[in-house]
From Swiss-Prot:
Family of the protein in this entry: Belongs to the major facilitator superfamily. Nitrate/nitrite porter (TC 2.A.1.8) family.
Region described as Disordered: 1-25, 221-295
Native organism taxonomy: Eukaryota, Fungi, Dikarya, Ascomycota, Pezizomycotina
Protein location: Cell membrane
Provenance organism: Elsinoe fawcettii (Citrus scab fungus)
GO molecular function, one term: nitrate transmembrane transporter activity
Record protein name field: Elsinochrome transporter 1
Length: 505
């Protein structure tokens, strides 16, 4: 991917209108709007969800009298709601209704339970608000789905990692800005006492209100899938998938003639090598952007799966590996983010603002560490040409995440330099890098099912690890090494699974 592509409009594939470069600095051309609004759509909903978790003890007066265990129960409610939302929205978007309509519907409803947080007075009041916010925030992963539908699979990895990076900075927004918001409502005359903490939820709610408009008014549906626009379909007049999931590249009965057949063959061989696939017949040239008279690239068409096909995809070995790894990394990130400020307060004796500033560093490093993970994966793949090498790197990152969790838990350090170094240095590097590595393995042909399952596993990990924090609320150091042991154990259990399904070989 050339740097010149960052500011220019990307070349598009005429068969499916997918961009072949990332127009990071040119959001007005080609797939630029899709890229821009995808990461914004990840950030703003998560910003509504996130403040419930890390700062309730100091931020919401109605919850100040709650027990720490009760607060962690509500954190679990939030994670469970997000998991349910992702499980519903991803398959609907990727395989049935289409991305645009699903996003517009979810985002239209999401601000209302966010505004309901202003009415929180007791623990019971926070339950419906937290649950419904979390459910609609399940749309946050659809930004990733929009990327894989709008860009060529060769750049789907970096195109997906960048938006998730920037969107995860909502943790930084919360830790840096929530204490000042709370202070503003507390010190400004005219605001009732109950607004001192809950009033801050008005801010992400206001930002959420205009979210559906760009997708509804400016953007088409994703170029592939059930909701693809007419101009994409007209290039594929005779395609009929009969509702079945299409296999990744296989033999085709007809291929176009080309004066430069040798270069096309070399390109095909490179793509086949990525899947460790040995062809028995010619393969499509769609990846080169050449028009095909009778068929399209099988690997880039998203079909509506039957229930049995969805089950087969979910329980395939590679999908389970993705789910297990994301369970470890994203689950750990969610749960650790929710207690990190409190952990720093206890271990280092800091106030709310200073502890929040240090905790924000962990989230801020997402913007660097996730791309580094994806870049390391790409570099290793170029050197080896084997998908196994990418899988081995993913497991290595996950194991090192577990090692640093165990180190933090056993060290019980009260030195600010040591503790912040372990958390924001070693742990952030491997944990957030592993999050970037995970999504580079998602197969586009079953995008909605695979990404929905993987995202749900990440939230399930957050629930499980939050439960561990809940039952060890007085000893967070112990929880760190327990989480580390779980992560390492899951890597040992899944490291032997092949990265490519047998049906594709």
């Amino acid at each position: 991917m050339a740097l010149s592509g960052l500011g220019s409009g990307p070349e598009g594939n005429p068969n499916n209108h997918q961009g072949k470069a990332i127009p990071t600095l040119n959001p007005s051309h080609g797939q630029g709007p899709s890229f821009l609004f995808s990461w914004v759509s990840f950030l703003v909903p998560f910003w509504s969800w996130y403040p419930f978790s890390p700062l309730p003890l100091k931020g919401i007066p109605g919850e100040n009298s709650s027990s720490p265990n009760g607060l962690k129960n509500f954190h679990g409610i939030g994670l469970n709601g997000t998991e349910r939302g992702m499980g519903h929205f991803h398959p609907i978007s990727g395989n049935r209704l289409g991305l645009r309509l699903t996003l517009v519907a979810g985002w239209f409803l999401e601000p209302f339970p966010t505004f309901l947080a202003v009415l929180i007075r007791t623990q019971g009041d926070s339950t419906p608000s937290r649950s419904f916010v979390a459910f609609f925030v399940g749309t946050l992963g659809l930004g990733q789905e929009g990327i894989t539908g709008s860009f060529n699979r060769k750049i789907a990895g970096p195109a997906t990692i960048d938006p998730q990076d920037w969107a995860m900075e909502e943790g930084v927004l919360t830790n840096f800005l929530w204490p000042p918001f709370t202070t503003f409502f507390r010190t400004t005359k005219g605001f009732p006492v109950q607004w001192h903490g809950e009033g801050s939820f008005v801010v992400p709610g206001i930002f959420s209100l205009p979210q559906p408009l760009p997708w509804w008014l400016l953007l088409p549906d994703t170029p592939t899938g059930a909701g693809k626009p007419p101009e994409s379909r007209q290039h594929q007049p005779s395609h009929s998938m009969n509702g079945a999931i299409v296999d990744i590249p296989g033999g085709l009965t007809q291929t176009p003639s080309s004066p430069d057949r040798s270069s096309s063959t070399n390109s095909i061989a490179d793509e086949e090598k990525k899947l460790d696939y040995k062809p028995t017949s010619p393969t499509s040239d769609t990846e080169k952007g050449e028009s095909l008279p009778l068929t399209a690239s099988q690997s880039e068409i998203i079909a509506s799966p039957t229930f049995s096909e969805m089950i087969r995809v979910i329980f395939s070995g590679p999908t389970l590996v993705l789910g297990a790894c994301y369970f470890c990394t994203f689950g750990a990130e969610l749960s650790i983010n929710s207690v990190l400020g409190t952990f720093y307060q206890r271990q280092l004796g800091l106030g709310l603002q200073n502890a929040g500033n240090l905790a924000a560093i962990f989230g801020l490093l997402n913007i660097v560490m996730r791309p580094l993970g994806g870049m390391a994966s790409d570099l290793l793949y170029r050197k080896t040409g084997s998908v196994w090498s990418k899988k081995a790197l993913l497991h290595t990152y996950c194991v090192m995440t577990g090692v640093f969790c165990i180190a933090i838990g056993l060290a019980r350090s009260r030195s600010q330099a040591t503790l912040v170094g372990l958390v924001s240095g070693g742990l952030a590097f491997f944990l957030e890098g592993a999050n970037g590595l995970t999504y580079s393995h998602v197969h586009p042909y079953a995008n909605g099912v695979v990404s929905g399952f993987t995202g749900a596993c990440g939230n399930l990990g957050g629930i499980v690890f939050a439960i561990v924090f809940r039952y060890n609320s007085l000893d967070y150091s112990k929880v760190f090494w327990i989480i580390g042991a779980i992560i390492i154990g899951l890597q040992v259990a899944t490291c032997w699974i092949k990265p490519v399904p047998k049906s594709v070989i």
